[in-house]
């Protein structure tokens, strides 16, 4: 019996245990403590005492009874979950219950009894304050019960009244900060009385409610009853729990849980709606009951198996969830009644004693229910033996390690079995409620079971809007049904999984037990002169093919071919292939196709594995192999007719072996029998009515099993097979020729080929071709848009989706495609073909419920014989079901739909399909690892279903040849750096004295502040919790307080005593003022400038104000945004200058040692550029002399980045980027293995976990890389009382040791262990810098790693795998990421692959490609006055603005003839959209001249279109808007940005880098101003939507994400509607701060203000009042005339009277001068006004899909209650879900990084709030 079981036994027998003065005490009912249990208690005495004393003892604090105290972790979670900002939040943790009371209940007496309860129980007088504290009010007024007198109502009316009360209360969310929180109500009818209780569980839990109801009833029945006074309080209990967190027991439990954390599974993967409503706050209650007899029977059966009834109920719940979870391993969230025996009266106290515990379940483990129940029970008891580290703590740690969302564990099990009744004891037992429902934040499903009312009450509360229709009911019925079976049947406990009744095994079709070539032979005899096949050389009849095959057969038989033998075929696509396979099969042998285009090494592997006796090929392709080679083109046909009959074969003889990609790195041969394949051929021919009138286009290669049907299925029906010319086999225009020439009736291909054909034909709209009557697509996902596009051209084609596996005779499942299927997420997989079965089974072989993902298994007559020469793999994939059937595990995932058909969901293993080719990733990995320098390799799949590509990652071995001794180089660099430190430091004694004086001043200030807590006046030690409460220290600052207390200990102010501290009697007496004066008097100004001293003093003297939030630490350091204090701290001091020069000299020495090497530098936490200035200045001469340097300056703050861009604008080799050291290092745009020198000045210490940071940074370092780091190397008290207030708490050994900084030795240890092979410090011990606590640290890393270019490796692999298997990306990593269980983390690799690689690879400026780029580059340099710019330089990134770009366009039109052909505003928009010389050159090359209409196809010669996009010219007569702009190339679904009111993409510039995400980023911008203005305003948005949708559609896009800001949101809405009509899928529609103006604007002043604000002009300088004042005036005017803002409505505001002058000021500011570009600026203004007028149109027709609305949290000063107005408008604009999200900023400045992060989340997780 474990300790947990022993405690549970005591609890079940109502035995109370507690410790007292080191002794074990107990209180037990008569007879409860028998001899055996007493002996167990004695044996476990020490363990019990350790458990009971696991935290501090009980401490009653009656004098603090009415002081606020903290929330428990669960209470805090409940309060936080009330916030609607969280998914699945926005509701209280609340129970609503109704109880029947006698009809004659006296309301006054019941009210008096209630108030007696309020007086007795403090938590009935409690409130929540500031969402973080709870407080018991000392006195409260008499609480009146709400009484509904309904005696005059009949039964129906009374029931209607009860429904109204229930509707009001059952989801109530009480105000926790207002007493009373609990407000019972009473409804008194004619013959009934009902008590309504809406209880917020934040204050009292379910067990407390039962105690309360029992005492309340008892007091009502006996008003004289008085319970013994309560000496224990919930507040005292919380105090114990708070102190317990400092105990060894808490640390032990924490270590135990964290050791398991990485292995814990996630939440149950239950099927959810396509768009679950994450904002829903409504729940539905399900209830069932086992009567007392059934419950006792279940308990008895549980006992027979050594289980408790409560454990069985939990196991049954886990079993049910496991049945419906798509992941077999998951965590359940258990609510635990946490009332430890800390005090004898604690069982009578009301409060929320709830704790949470995560229970890991793996539903695959255990062959019977009993085994699984035992395993769950054992795990639960293990968990409950470590209770002090709470489930909430664990969830927080999960979120920290795995990211946001990992802490959502929404499936809850709440058991009151035994525990509630034990708690109630012999008291008044409450009655069962007549109705009950509960809600909990962040919970999807809460299962509650209790036996307190006799029998077992079963309740589920399920959040609405999440699960598909009917699923919750089905799950609940499964659970209840399982409990009933366990109560009734002994077999339910011990039998394995009961399988569903199995239908009879599928039967083969009559006539299918024959050779697959028999049908061809019959047709050859029946119609010998009919055409059998066409190829590039001509046509051949059945007779000709048969005669040639007969000749080949004779030769092959001479070489040993016959039954049981195999012959390889290696021929190009031609009629010879059909001849070869017929001849081989006529000989009784099996054929083995070998693709002639495959690399020689792979061909050799296939031939060796297949053990062929002969090879059929062309004379020109005879390979050097160990078998006979027969040149088919040298054989003459047999003249005899009819040919001899085929050799006899059995139905189960081998027909062919097709090799597919193999998981072991070598191809695997799939062996198919004649009977298996013949069944499929016969079914397809009958199903689709194939006959001699059909012509099949044979696109599939012979090595792809679709060709089996082309050659044997089609010819068996007498059809003709048409083969493409192998030289044009991938050319869709050639396929179109064949369609036309041969009138193809049957199309059989992978979907990608069908899409290629349609893509081509849509670029040739005038070409009309006959279409196939029947289309078979298989082998890969079918894009849902493809059928619609196909039907648009050939509406009479019957389309079919087929699926299966090479291991199961070509196809096994079929789905006729209907128009409604194109509206789904994917085309359904369908139902099994005849003679076959296709099932979705879970990990235990059970048929999955509808909607639950499982593995697809194929059975029936079509199964392969196995894999050639590989019995082990055959046994792994071809399995026996428990019912005896042989099944093939496909590795494909699927689920049943409601109608019983199957939906395909992808793969579960490392096998993928790329454009129809089945690829084992392991084979590619093996080819990569064959390179002698590659150690490990891993490949992942990128992209959506039909746009997939591969990304491979490798790690390298150590280099074979040893180079220079790394120590020699390190020492040489150290010496160079040390020389740079030499200077006149003055007296070292004086420096040491100043450092000591500074420490004393800081400690004196700390002690003075701490005195306010009463610490120095207290005679007893004060612990940390007490100090935090008295000083108002938040939990986040407790670690800093611990550090300060330690420093004061060392300074002689305090001494530690137990868990607290006492003031020292002989502590330093120096006042803070005197101490700071003393320091200022001895501090050398060269080291501590006066401004720095003043800052340190001010910060130390205002600690209380800073901690309370009254003074901002950042504002102290950067007063009014000035960096002068930071300059004094980081740049001006003599020590700072010396340290930075040492860093610079070290880096120069490193570069000079290998001048031919390209050096990529990454500076972390560059901040004010204090070190960067010196380093860059030192490197600049080296760059000028030819050194190739790429310097990336990074910081987490945009403030510092902006300043650095300006400072280093003259250094084109210096780039800038945001980098967060505490974020995911591999998710910030810096590619792994790409940094040669990493430098940092004083920043690494700011990391939360510096060793982990160094380990992560190592991933970024290339082979033979360097680290150059400057850091603080002792405790700096001046930092602890200043900048530490802006720093987060460290999580490494600094936290354990209560330090802020570490010494040089620790830094070197970290570097040696994590970041460098060799490391050293530069500063000599005892020197001035050492006394000051600084050092420069050098490390040389990865000297044992090889250098290998990806291009070299790719060329190596190309010789070993087919081209379709080559990775699109190939990257070198330091190590492959692994999951917690040691497996390669492919999710992390996919994240790496989606990161841009350009940041550290393209540092060298590219030369202009032609004269146009050269001319534009010259203009760029001239206008920006920067001769070092390159053709990829962003105009705005180099310091440009709207004025300068207008000047650039003006000069461009003066100097370039090609530019003069376009109007100014078109050129301006192009430049705004693509603001680089190369980007603008692309537009000029591809654009038509004025008046000619666009020609997007011309762009093909300049740059490739984005992935998934095929550019095509518009039809003749199309409006010349040419709106489509390519912003960022990439792969995947493009994101399209829709222009705002100016017609440009300028506002989106802050988002471009963040939104690239490795996928295409396109823009829609106004191309022709006149055409834009010609559209009536009331029709503008709809018209633009149609035109833009047409442009996107004609560009070949079939799936997009749309983003519209401001008025662009309205255009985006219309574009989305039109795209859907054209069959283009709008995956996401994102609207940002877009407002339809509900009134007409006749006062131009408002338009001018909005125009100026949109351009970013200074509106105050232009004479406008503050935006808030302007908004007030607008609202005042609209109050008079709500439908329009009349002219002159705003004229009374200061500065706005003269409209003409105001307009002139705005337009002049817009163009930059009074005269220049006046026409263009006026056009821009006209465009803007036109867009505004369009925004005043009537509300549009709603969009049928979903959208996301992003609302700026600062609102729009011109629109009151802006968020509410936006939400109202956009909810009405979409029939689908409308997700509402707040983003930082106001309307004019909300397009920032926070918005980019929000946009990155996919729409399927959005829902209506």
Curated annotation (Swiss-Prot):
Pfam families: AMP-binding (PF00501), Condensation (PF00668), Methyltransf_12 (PF08242), PP-binding (PF00550), TubC_N (PF18563)
Domain Carrier: 1407-1488
InterPro entries hit by this protein: AA_adenyl_dom (IPR010071), AB_hydrolase_fold (IPR029058), ACP-like_sf (IPR036736), AMP-bd_C_sf (IPR045851), AMP-binding (IPR020459), AMP-binding_CS (IPR020845), AMP-dep_synth/lig_dom (IPR000873), ANL_N_sf (IPR042099)
One GO term (biological process): secondary metabolite biosynthetic process
Enzymatic reactions: holo-[peptidyl-carrier protein] + L-cysteine + ATP = L-cysteinyl-[peptidyl-carrier protein] + AMP + diphosphate
Keywords for this protein: Ligase, Phosphopantetheine, Phosphoprotein
Class of the enzyme per the UniProt entry, highest EC level: ligase
Enzyme Commission number, as recorded: 6.2.1.69
Residue pairs linked by disulfide bridges in the UniProt entry: none
Stretches for region Adenylation: 520-915
Molecular function GO labels: ligase activity; phosphopantetheine binding
Knockout consequences: Mutant can still form salicylate and Dha, but is no longer able to synthesize pyochelin.
Modified residues (O-(pantetheine 4'-phosphoryl)serine): 1442
Pathway: Siderophore biosynthesis
Induction comment: Expression of the pchEF operon is strictly dependent on the PchR regulator and is induced by extracellular pyochelin, the end product of the pathway. Repressed by Fur and iron.
Ranges for region Condensation/cyclization: 69-490
Entry GO CC: cytoplasm
Co-factor requirement: pantetheine 4'-phosphate
NCBIfam families: AA-adenyl-dom (TIGR01733)
Free-text note regarding domains: Modular protein that contains a condensation/cyclization domain involved in the cyclization of the cysteine, an adenylation domain which activates the cysteine residue into an aminoacyl-AMP ester, a peptidyl carrier protein (PCP2) domain which bears a phosphopantetheinyl arm to attach the activated cysteine and a thioesterase domain (TE) that may release the newly synthesized peptide from the enzyme.
Function: Involved in the biosynthesis of the siderophore pyochelin. Adenylates L-cysteine and loads it onto its peptidyl carrier domain via a thioester linkage to the phosphopanthetheine moiety. Then forms a peptide bond between the salicyl-thiazolinyl intermediate bound to the second carrier domain of PchE and the cysteine bound to its own peptidyl carrier domain to form the salicyl-thiazolinyl-cysteinyl-S-PCP2 intermediate. It subsequently cyclizes the C-terminal cysteine to form the second thiazoline heterocycle in the salicyl-thiazolinyl-thiazolinyl-S-PCP2 intermediate.
Family in the record: Belongs to the NRP synthetase family.
The name this protein goes by in its record: Pyochelin synthetase PchF
Lineage of producing organism: Bacteria, Pseudomonadati, Pseudomonadota, Gammaproteobacteria, Pseudomonadales
């Amino acid at each position: 019996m474990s300790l947990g079981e022993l405690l549970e036994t005591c609890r079940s027998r109502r035995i109370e245990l507690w410790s007292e003065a080191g002794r074990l005490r107990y209180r037990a009912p008569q007879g409860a403590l028998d001899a055996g249990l007493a002996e167990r208690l004695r044996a476990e005495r020490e363990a019990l005492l350790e458990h009971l004393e696991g935290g501090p003892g009980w401490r009653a604090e009656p004098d603090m009874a009415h002081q606020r105290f903290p929330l428990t972790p669960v209470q805090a979670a409940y309060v936080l979950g009330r916030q609607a900002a969280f998914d699945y939040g926005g509701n209280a943790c609340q129970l609503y219950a109704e109880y029947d009371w006698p009809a004659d209940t006296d309301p006054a007496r019941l009210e008096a009894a209630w108030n007696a309860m309020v007086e007795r129980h403090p938590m009935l007088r409690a409130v929540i304050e500031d969402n973080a504290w709870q407080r018991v009010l000392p006195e409260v007024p008499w609480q009146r019960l709400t009484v509904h007198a309904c005696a005059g109502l009949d039964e129906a009316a009374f029931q209607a009244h009860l429904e109204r009360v229930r509707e009001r209360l059952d989801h109530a969310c009480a105000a926790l900060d207002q007493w009373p929180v609990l407000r019972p109500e009473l409804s008194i009818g004619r013959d009934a009385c009902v008590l309504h209780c809406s209880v917020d569980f934040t204050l009292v839990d379910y067990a407390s409610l039962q105690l309360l109801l029992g005492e309340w009833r008892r007091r009502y029945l006996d008003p004289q009853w008085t319970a013994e006074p309560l000496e224990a309080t919930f507040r005292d209990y919380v105090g114990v729990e708070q102190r317990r967190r400092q105990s060894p027991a808490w640390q032990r439990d924490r270590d135990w849980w964290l050791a398991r954390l990485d292995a814990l599974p996630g939440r149950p993967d239950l099927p959810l709606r396509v768009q679950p409503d994450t904002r829903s706050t409504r729940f539905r209650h399900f209830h069932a009951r086992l009567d007392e007899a059934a419950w006792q029977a279940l308990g008895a059966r549980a006992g027979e198996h050594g289980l408790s009834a409560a454990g069985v109920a939990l196991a049954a719940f886990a079993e049910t969830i496991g049945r419906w979870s798509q992941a077999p391993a998951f965590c359940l969230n258990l609510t635990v009644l946490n009332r430890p025996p800390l005090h004898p009266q604690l069982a009578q106290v009301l409060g929320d004693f709830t704790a949470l515990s995560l229970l890991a379940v793996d539903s695959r483990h255990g062959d019977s229910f009993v085994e699984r129940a035992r395993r769950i029970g054992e795990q639960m008891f293990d968990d409950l033996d470590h209770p002090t580290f709470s489930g909430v703590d664990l969830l927080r740690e999960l979120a920290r390690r795995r990211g946001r969302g990992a802490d959502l564990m929404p499936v809850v099990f709440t058991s009151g079995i035994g525990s509630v009744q034990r708690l109630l004891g012999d008291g008044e037992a409450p009655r069962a409620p007549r109705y009950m429902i509960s809600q909990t934040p962040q919970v999807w499903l809460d299962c509650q079971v209790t036996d307190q009312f006799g029998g077992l009450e079963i309740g589920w509360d399920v959040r609405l809007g999440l699960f598909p229709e009917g699923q919750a009911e089905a799950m609940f019925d499964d659970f209840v049904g399982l409990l009933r079976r366990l109560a009734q049947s002994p077999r339910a406990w011990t039998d394995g999984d009961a399988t569903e009744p199995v239908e009879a095994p599928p039967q083969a079709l009559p006539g299918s037990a024959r050779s697959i070539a028999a049908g061809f032979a019959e047709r050859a005899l029946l119609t010998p002169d009919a055409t059998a096949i066409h190829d590039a050389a001509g046509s051949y009849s059945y007779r000709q093919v048969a005669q040639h095959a007969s000749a080949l057969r004779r030769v092959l038989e001479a070489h040993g071919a016959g039954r049981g033998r195999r012959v390889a075929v290696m021929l190009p696509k031609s009629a010879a292939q059909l001849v070869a396979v017929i001849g081989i099969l006529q000989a009784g042998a099996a054929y083995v196709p070998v693709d002639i285009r495959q690399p020689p090494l792979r061909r050799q592997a296939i031939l060796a594995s297949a053990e062929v006796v002969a090879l059929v090929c062309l004379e020109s392709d005879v390979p050097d192999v160990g078998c006979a080679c027969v040149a088919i083109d040298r054989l003459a046909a047999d003249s005899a007719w009819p040919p001899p009959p085929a050799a006899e074969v059995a139905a189960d003889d081998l027909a062919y072996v097709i090799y597919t990609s193999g998981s072991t790195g070598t191809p695997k041969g799939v062996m198919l029998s004649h009977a298996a394949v013949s069944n499929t051929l016969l079914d397809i021919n009958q199903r689709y009515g194939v006959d001699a009138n059909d012509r099949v286009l044979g696109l599939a290669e012979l090595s792809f099993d679709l060709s089996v049907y082309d050659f044997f299925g089609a010819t068996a029906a007498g059809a003709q097979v048409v083969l493409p010319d192998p030289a044009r086999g991938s050319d869709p225009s050639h396929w179109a020729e064949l369609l036309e020439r041969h009138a193809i009736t049957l199309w059989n291909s992978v979907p990608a080929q069908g899409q290629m054909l349609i893509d081509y034909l849509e670029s040739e709209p005038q070409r009309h071709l006959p279409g196939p009557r029947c289309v078979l697509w298989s082998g890969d996902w079918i894009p849902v848009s493809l059928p619609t596009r196909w039907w648009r051209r050939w509406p009479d084609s019957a389309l079919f989706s087929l699926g299966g596996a090479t291991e199961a005779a070509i196809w096994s499942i079929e789905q006729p495609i209907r128009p409604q299927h194109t509206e789904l997420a994917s085309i359904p997989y369908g139902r099994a073909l005849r003679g076959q079965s296709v099932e979705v089974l879970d990990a235990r072989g059970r048929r999955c419920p509808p909607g639950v993902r499982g593995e697809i298994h194929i059975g029936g007559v079509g199964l392969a014989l196995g894999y050639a020469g590989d019995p082990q793999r055959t046994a792994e994939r071809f399995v026996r079901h428990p019912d005896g059937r042989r099944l093939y595990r496909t590795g494909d995932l699927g689920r049943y739909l409601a109608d019983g058909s199957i939906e395909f969901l992808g793969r579960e293993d490392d096998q993928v399909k790329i454009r129809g080719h089945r690829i084992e990733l392991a084979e590619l990995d093996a080819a990569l690892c064959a390179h002698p320098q590659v150690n490990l390799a891993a490949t992942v799949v990128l992209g959506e279903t039909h746009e997939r590509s591969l990304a491979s990652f490798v790690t390298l071995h150590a280099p074979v040849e040893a180079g220079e001794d790394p120590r020699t180089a390190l020492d040489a660099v150290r010496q160079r750096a040390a020389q740079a430190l030499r200077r006149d430091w003055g007296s070292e004694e004086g420096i040491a004295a100043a450092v000591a004086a500074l420490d004393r001043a800081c400690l004196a200030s700390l002690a003075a502040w701490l005195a306010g807590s009463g610490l120095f006046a207290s005679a007893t030690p004060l612990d940390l919790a007490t100090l935090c409460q008295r000083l108002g220290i938040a939990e986040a600052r407790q670690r800093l307080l611990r550090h300060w207390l330690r420093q004061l200990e060392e300074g002689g102010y305090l001494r530690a005593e137990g868990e607290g501290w006492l003031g020292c009697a002989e502590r330093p007496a120096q006042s803070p003022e005197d101490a700071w004066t003393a320091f200022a008097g001895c501090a050398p100004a060269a080291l501590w400038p006066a401004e720095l001293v003043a800052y340190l003093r001010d910060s130390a003297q205002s600690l209380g104000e800073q901690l309370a939030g009254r003074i901002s630490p950042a504002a102290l350091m950067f007063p009014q945004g000035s960096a002068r204090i930071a300059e004094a701290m980081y740049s001006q001091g003599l020590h700072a200058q010396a340290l930075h020069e040492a860093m610079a000299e070290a880096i120069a020495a490193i570069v000079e040692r290998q001048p031919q090497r390209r050096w990529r530098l990454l500076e972390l936490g560059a901040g004010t550029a204090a070190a960067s200035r010196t380093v860059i200045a030192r490197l600049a001469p080296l760059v000028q002399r030819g050194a190739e340097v790429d310097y990336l300056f990074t910081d987490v703050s945009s403030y510092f980045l902006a300043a650095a861009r300006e400072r280093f604008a003259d250094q084109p080799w210096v780039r800038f980027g945001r980098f967060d050291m505490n974020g995911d290092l591999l998710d910030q745009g810096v590619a792994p293995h790409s940094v040669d020198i990493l430098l940092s000045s004083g920043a690494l210490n700011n990391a939360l976990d510096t060793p982990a940071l160094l380990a992560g940074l190592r991933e970024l370092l290339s082979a033979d890389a360097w680290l150059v780091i400057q850091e603080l190397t002792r405790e700096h008290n001046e930092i602890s009382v200043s900048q530490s207030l802006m720093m987060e708490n460290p999580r490494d050994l600094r936290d354990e040791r209560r330090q802020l900084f570490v010494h040089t030795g620790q830094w070197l240890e970290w570097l040696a262990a994590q970041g460098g092979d060799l490391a050293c410090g530069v500063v000599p011990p005892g020197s001035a810098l050492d006394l000051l606590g600084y050092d420069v640290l050098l490390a040389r890393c990865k000297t044992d790693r090889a250098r290998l270019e990806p291009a070299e490796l790719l060329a190596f692999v190309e010789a070993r795998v087919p081209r379709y298997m080559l990775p699109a990306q190939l990257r070198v990593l330091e190590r492959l990421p692994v999951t917690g269980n040691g497996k390669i983390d492919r999710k992390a690799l996919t994240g790496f692959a989606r990161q841009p690689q350009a940041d550290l690879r393209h540092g060298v400026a590219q030369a202009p490609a032609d004269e146009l780029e050269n001319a534009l580059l010259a203009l760029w340099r001239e206008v920006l006055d920067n001769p070092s710019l390159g053709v990829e330089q962003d105009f705005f990134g180099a310091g440009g603005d709207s004025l300068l770009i207008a000047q650039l366009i003006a000069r461009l039109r003066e100097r370039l003839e090609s530019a003069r052909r376009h109007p100014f505003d078109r050129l301006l928009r192009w430049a705004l959209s693509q603001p680089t010389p190369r980007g603008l050159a692309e537009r000029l090359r591809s654009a038509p001249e004025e008046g000619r209409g666009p020609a997007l196809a011309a762009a093909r010669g300049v740059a490739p279109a984005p992935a998934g996009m095929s550019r095509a010219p518009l039809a003749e007569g199309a409006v010349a808007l040419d709106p489509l702009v390519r912003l960022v190339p990439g792969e995947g679904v493009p994101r399209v940005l829709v222009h705002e009111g100016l017609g440009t993409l300028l506002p989106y510039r802050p988002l471009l880098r963040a939104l690239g995400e490795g996928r295409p980023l396109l823009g829609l911008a106004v191309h022709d101003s006149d055409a834009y203005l010609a559209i009536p305003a009331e029709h503008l948005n709809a018209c633009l939507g149609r035109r833009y949708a047409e442009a996107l559609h004609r560009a070949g896009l079939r799936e997009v994400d749309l983003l519209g800001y401001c008025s662009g949101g309205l255009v985006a809405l219309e574009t989305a509607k039109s795209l859907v009509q054209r069959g283009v899928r709008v995956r996401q529609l994102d609207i940002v701060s877009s407002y339809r103006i509900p009134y007409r604007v006749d006062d131009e002043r408002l338009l001018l203000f909005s125009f100026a604000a949109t351009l970013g002009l200074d509106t105050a300088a232009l004479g406008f009042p503050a935006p808030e004042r302007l908004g007030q005036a607008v609202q005042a005017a609209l109050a008079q005339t709500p439908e329009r803002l009349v002219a002159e409505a705003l004229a009374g505001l200061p500065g706005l009277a003269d409209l003409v002058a105001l307009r002139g000021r705005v337009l002049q500011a817009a163009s930059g001068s009074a005269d220049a570009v006046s026409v263009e600026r006026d056009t821009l203004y006209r465009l803007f006004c036109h867009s505004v007028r369009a925004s005043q149109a009537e509300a549009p027709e709603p969009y049928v899909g979903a959208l996301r609305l992003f609302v700026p949290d600062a609102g729009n000063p011109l629109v009151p209650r802006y968020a509410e107005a936006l939400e109202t408008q956009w909810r009405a604009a979409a029939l689908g879900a409308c997700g509402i999200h707040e983003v930082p900023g106001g309307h004019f400045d909300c397009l920032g990084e926070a918005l980019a992060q929000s946009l990155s989340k996919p729409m399927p997780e959005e829902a209506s709030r």
